[in-house]
Amino acid sequence: MKDRILNRGGSDHTIMKISDKKVLVTGAGGFIGSHLCEELVKSEARVRAMVRYNSSESHGLLEGLPRELYNRLEIVSGDIRDIDSVTKAVSGCDIVFHLAALIGIPYSYHAPKSYVDTNVVGTLNVMQACRQESVERVIHTSTSEVYGTAMYIPIDEHHPLQGQSPYSASKIAADKIAESYYLSFNLPVVTIRPFNCYGPRQSSRAFIPAMVSQLLSESVIKCGYLAPQRDYTFVKDTVAGFIAAALVPGIEGMTINVGTGKKISMGDLLQRIMSRMDLMKQILPEESRLRPPKSEVMALICDNTRARAFLGWEPGYTLDQGLDEVVSFVKSNSNRYKTDHFVV
């Protein structure tokens, strides 16, 4: 992948340009995907949102968008494992944001093949369809989990990759499929590698909303291992990185980390959440919420030099500002959250 570093303009300029584009978002019903669709519609892009077909005809987290924005989406159902539905969804689009994936790390220990089918074969289908339809730019979504336990921090894009779970291994393979389509076929791919992302609408599978939900309703807080360190980025900042990556010229073939560069342990984060909520409760780590020892990733801290230099990107939300938004959302939507649903 390319290693050149250039100075680029800021995000305000690039967001205005998205209004010229017809875009596809795969995984649109997910957490980041729904926020990306929301921002794209606000920015006057013509948005086709691909959600996984289901018998209830649910559109996932897109249904939480304000109605006036939701109604401006072109929603299509399909499955990225099916090349025909992917090709149909890609047809006529200028830019493709590929976010669809199986993301739960714990389930990958039990059903690794399903992660290969969706994350690897699905990504292959998206790249092939984009090549066939001659799209202008493909934004492929990676994850900081591909780095495994850090050999050094902060982690830059040159850090070795290590598959410490079947999930992360499948994402490494997907990243390499995307890279191969750039190198072999000159497909204009940019890979965005987000570090831990959080914000409103995130499910209780994730640490922050799970802890907020428990604090609101339980006397004892059940959690997993609290020593690992993470770099948490508010979802609106992550989305700004995606949009900039779609529009900044000359960055095809690059992988770009998106994260704040600030570290916090899970234990300190839980204390920070309790402080913001003014609620102090007993903490009880549970073995069932722990990863296998060799699979645990102890530190994921972002070096965002490349995002700042190439995309003109920088985080706009402090951790406290973002936590306050999550707390407000969970309080207003407590019926959506199960306090026993948190997974590692």
Stretches with model-predicted labels:
Residues 67-73, 185-188, 212-222, 248, ...:
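A short C-terminal helix-loop "cap" of Rossmann-like NAD(P)-dependent dehydrogenase/epimerase domains
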Residues 172, 197-210, 219, 235-236, ...:
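Glycine/proline-rich active-site loop of Rossmann-fold NAD(P)-dependent oxidoreductases
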Residues 3-197, 325, 329-333, 342-344:
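N-terminal Rossmann-like NAD(P)+-binding domain of SDR-like oxidoreductases, especially those catalyzing
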Residues 238, 242, 258, 269, ...:
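Non-catalytic, hydrophobic alpha-helical segments
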Residues 81, 110, 118, 165, ...:
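Residue-level signal for the nucleotide or nucleotide-sugar donor/cofactor binding architecture
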Residues 225, 253-256, 267-270, 278-299, ...:
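C-terminal "lid/loop" region of Rossmann-like NAD(P)-dependent oxidoreductases
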Residues 173, 177, 181, 211, ...:
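Hydrophobic alpha-helix immediately C-terminal to the catalytic Tyr-X-X-X-Lys motif of short-chain
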Residues 235, 255, 290-314, 325:
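Conserved C-terminal active-site "lid" loop/helix of NAD(P)H-dependent oxidoreductases
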